[in-house]
């Protein structure tokens, strides 16, 4: 058995994983779908344990357990949950355990990656989440909104005449809209208008939160972006930002190596 740690981030859309060495470097990593895919762990050395963040429910937990058991029977497993304090981060939630494990691990990863900086962490998945993290590691609170895809899908499902637009289709529509400078960012047909409107709603939320946080804290705040829809939302942002797409796995590595 190696000193490596298997890290698993089970979100609502995909399951991401990494194998981290004793220096918390990712030796290898990947992602797979919940039902239709599986990771190839056949050549990986046996880790000393698995650290799991799961916000996708019981079915995802059972599948992860089955995958681990098939490759490394009886491997020790730790299901990560938010706590009052861990790895230099303190939890400002009134009930700390109710904070999602992915958000908690992401906060720990962000605090380590950008030490001594005030942060606003925006993660774009099924939901869009924002976390306000002070330079001293105190999580001051957050916001949760529908993600870009969920926002577009909700309009298609709950209105009589609006279409349901996927992320891939919306991205192509926005490319077309950007080529027509005479109208951008305003669209002259419904699919373009829906795609651009939901994208601008995401960007507007982020920019408003960032400006409000800098005003409240009277100090610079680094805006950190993460998540699958970040590529699209970046195109609508007009404020400085930094990308970091492994915050949760980085946080899980820190939690694992502090155990």
UniProtKB/Swiss-Prot annotation:
Substrate binds at residues 93, 100-103, 190. Keywords: ATP-binding, Coenzyme A biosynthesis, Cytoplasm, Kinase, Nucleotide-binding, Potassium, Transferase. ATP binds at residues 9-16, 126. It comes from the Bacteria. One of its GO terms (cellular component) is cytoplasm. Its main location: cytoplasm. Its cofactor is NH4(+); K(+). A monovalent cation. Ammonium or potassium. GO terms for biological process: coenzyme A biosynthetic process. Pathway: Cofactor biosynthesis; coenzyme A biosynthesis; CoA from (R)-pantothenate: step 1/5. Its EC number is 2.7.1.33. It holds the Pfam family Pan_kinase. GO terms for molecular function: ATP binding; pantothenate kinase activity. Belongs to the type III pantothenate kinase family. This is Type III pantothenate kinase. It comes from Burkholderia pseudomallei (strain K96243).
């Amino acid at each position: 058995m190696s000193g490596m740690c298997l890290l698993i981030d089970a979100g609502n859309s995909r399951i991401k994983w990494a194998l981290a060495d004793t220096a918390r470097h990712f030796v290898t990593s990947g992602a797979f779908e919940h039902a239709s895919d599986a990771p190839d762990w056949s050549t990986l050395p046996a880790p000393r344990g698995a650290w799991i963040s799961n916000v996708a429910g019981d079915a995802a937990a059972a599948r992860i357990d089955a995958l681990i058991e098939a490759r490394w029977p009886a491997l020790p497993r730790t299901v990560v949950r938010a706590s009052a304090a861990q790895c230099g981060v303190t939890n400002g939630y009134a009930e700390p355990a109710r904070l999602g494990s992915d958000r908690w691990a992401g906060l720990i990863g962000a605090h380590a990656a950008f030490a001594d900086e005030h942060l606003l962490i925006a993660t774009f998945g099924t939901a869009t989440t924002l976390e306000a993290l002070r330079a001293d590691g105190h999580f001051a609170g957050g916001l949760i909104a529908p993600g870009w895809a969920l926002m577009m899908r909700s309009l298609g499902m709950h209105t009589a005449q609006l279409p349901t637009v996927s992320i891939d289709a919306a991205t192509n529509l926005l490319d077309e809209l950007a080529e027509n400078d005479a109208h951008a960012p305003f669209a002259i047909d419904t699919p373009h208008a829906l795609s651009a409107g939901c994208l601008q709603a995401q960007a507007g939320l982020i920019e408003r939160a960032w400006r409000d946080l800098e005003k409240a804290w009277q100090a610079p705040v680094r805006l950190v972006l993460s998540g699958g829809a970040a590529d699209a939302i970046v195109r609508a942002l007009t404020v400085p930002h930094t990308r970091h797409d492994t915050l949760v796995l980085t946080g899980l590595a820190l939690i694992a190596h502090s155990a």
